[in-house]
Amino acid sequence: MYIDTGIMSNNIFLFAFFALVGLTRIEAMPTKGSEGTWDVDYEDQEHTGITCRENEHYNSTRIECEEECNDRNNKLCYRFQQFCWCNEGYIRNSSHICVKLEDCLKDEEQKSETLASSANNDSSKRLEDDLKLFSHDSVSHTSLEPETQAQKFNGIIDQETLDLVFGKPENSWAENKPLETKTQAQKFNGKIDQETLDLVFGKPKNSSAEKKPLETETQAQKFNGIIDQETLD
């Protein structure tokens, strides 16, 4: 039996070549280390200029972008990490660092609580500021304090209080001829005689009153009782 040594040599060479290529591909795949980290193909990293960071491994057969920690629908496709994937059980956070999934979820919960607390504090502060502003406006537009107003307007309001509230009228008869309420009450209390009538209404000139005195009793009946302001006018 004749064996062509040339063909055999070529077959051996091809077998050795494909075996070498296969071993190279196997070495390029990441392998999990003893401490949970991944060994990477430093030759490929050196060739591509990409260095994977902690909790990452090199992957030259990348098909899709990675998921982000705080948004699973937001894919990370940054150029500097296109061949470095997070190890199994890790996920990339908003700082582009691979962290454990439970740490990622815990971090997101803390962020949510912080945002909610901040929003509540902002709302409380705005409400407090609004109350202060409303209180300031109310005080600035009120000249009299509530307690003082209650004291001033409790019971009968006299002319002095009215002038204080509504303003004192100019050229008022009150300035020229102030009325003494107590004195008037004393003067007009009971029967009114002719002298009192003359004092109030004035004594008429050339009056028949000098010859024919008035009937005091009749006048007293007319003006007996309390004389109001209209009668005085």
From Swiss-Prot:
Residues 52-104 form the TIL domain. Residues 1-28 form the signal peptide. The keyword Calcium does not apply. Residues 201-233 are annotated as: Disordered. Keywords: Host-virus interaction, Inhibition of host innate immune response by virus, Signal, Viral immunoevasion. Changing R79A: Loss of inhibitory activity. InterPro entries: Ser_inhib-like_sf, TIL_dom. GO terms for biological process: symbiont-mediated suppression of host innate immune response. The keyword Signal applies. CDD domains: TIL. Interacts with host PAP1 and PAP3. Counteracts the host humoral immune response by inhibiting the processing and the amidolytic activity of host PAP3. Thereby, melanization of host hemolymph, normally producing several reactive intermediates toxic for viruses, is deregulated and proper immune response cannot occur. Belongs to the polydnaviridae EGF-like motif protein family. This is Protease inhibitor Egf1.0. It comes from Microplitis demolitor bracovirus (isolate Webb) (MdBV). The lineage of its organism: Viruses, Viruses incertae sedis, Polydnaviriformidae, Bracoviriform, Microplitis demolitor bracovirus.
